């Protein structure tokens, strides 16, 4: 989860988020090299006293500055497209969770089981227990198994919302009348926090998301207690 004065990403807890972190580092390194080259050329232009008054064209330079940017864009685009398809691809999900956004709470439905649905509201600050996080705790947490592919079906009943859990690399818009799909698979147990990431009204800041990822055995025990 996030911590005060954090400048980087949250720790990755899913294969998708790990890929996103690798892609971020890959792109950042390319940007660093380009920026260094530009600064080097600018410093040369400011310090050199050499002048070429008879230069009319430079075919070699024009060829290089056309091909090189194209190659750099390809180096960025290929891993980006790979991750994009990974995020959308889900063939055999072990579980399906339907999420509906409301003003200003979330409702969840485990579609593989009958009558397993609940609403999730933010816990007021006055009701927080010691150790709980202000504006991030909810009255009903979403419990899911680890190391299993979960298909998220996300929509809204009123306005635009966005269901986001940074540690898992999930951010999907909840659009009224449209059912969006996302893939979720946690690589380790834990409690993961998120929030609505689309301005949706006066209480937009009070729509937290809490996922409790547990081993399959504990998930089955939780299911039995809920059914």
Swiss-Prot record:
It comes from the Eukaryota. InterPro entries: CcO_II, CcO_II-like_C, CcO_II_C, Copper_CuA, Cupredoxin, Cyt_c_oxidase_su2, Cyt_c_oxidase_su2_TM_dom, Cyt_c_oxidase_su2_TM_sf. It is an enzyme of class 7 (translocase). One of its GO terms (biological process) is ATP synthesis coupled electron transport. This is Cytochrome c oxidase subunit 2. The keyword ATP-binding does not apply. Its EC number is 7.1.1.9. Pfam families: COX2 (PF00116), COX2_TM (PF02790). It catalyses: 4 Fe(II)-[cytochrome c] + O2 + 8 H(+)(in) = 4 Fe(III)-[cytochrome c] + 2 H2O + 4 H(+)(out). The gene is MT-CO2. GO terms for cellular component: mitochondrial inner membrane; respiratory chain complex IV. Belongs to the cytochrome c oxidase subunit 2 family. Component of the cytochrome c oxidase, the last enzyme in the mitochondrial electron transport chain which drives oxidative phosphorylation. The respiratory chain contains 3 multisubunit complexes succinate dehydrogenase (complex II, CII), ubiquinol-cytochrome c oxidoreductase (cytochrome b-c1 complex, complex III, CIII) and cytochrome c oxidase (complex IV, CIV), that cooperate to transfer electrons derived from NADH and succinate to molecular oxygen, creating an electrochemical gradient over the inner membrane that drives transmembrane transport and the ATP synthase. Its cofactor is Cu cation. Component of the cytochrome c oxidase (complex IV, CIV), a multisubunit enzyme composed of 14 subunits. The complex is composed of a catalytic core of 3 subunits MT-CO1, MT-CO2 and MT-CO3, encoded in the mitochondrial DNA, and 11 supernumerary subunits COX4I, COX5A, COX5B, COX6A, COX6B, COX6C, COX7A, COX7B, COX7C, COX8 and NDUFA4, which are encoded in the nuclear genome.
């Amino acid at each position: 989860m996030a911590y005060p004065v954090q400048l980087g990403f949250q720790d990755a807890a899913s294969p998708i988020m790990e890929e996103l972190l690798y892609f971020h580092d890959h792109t950042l390194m390319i940007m660093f090299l380009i920026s260094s080259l530009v600064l080097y050329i600018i410093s040369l232009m400011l310090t050199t006293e050499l002048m070429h008054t008879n230069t009319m064209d430079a075919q070699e330079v024009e060829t290089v500055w056309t091909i090189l940017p194209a190659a750099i864009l390809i180096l960025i685009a290929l891993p980006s497209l790979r991750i994009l398809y990974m995020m959308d691809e889900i063939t055999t999900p072990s579980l399906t969770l339907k999420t509906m956004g409301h003003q200003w709470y979330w409702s969840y439905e485990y579609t593989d089981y009958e009558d397993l649905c609940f609403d999730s509201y933010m816990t007021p600050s006055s009701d927080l227990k010691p150790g709980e996080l202000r504006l991030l705790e909810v009255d009903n947490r979403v419990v899911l198994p680890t190391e299993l592919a979960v298909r998220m079906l996300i929509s809204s009943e009123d306005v635009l919302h966005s269901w986001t859990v940074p540690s898992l690399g999930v951010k999907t818009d909840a659009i009224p009348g449209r059912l969006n799909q996302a893939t979720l698979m946690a690589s380790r147990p834990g409690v993961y926090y998120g929030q609505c990431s689309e301005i949706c009204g006066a209480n937009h800041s009070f729509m937290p998301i809490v996922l409790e990822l547990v081993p399959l055995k504990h998930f089955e025990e939780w299911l039995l207690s809920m059914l």
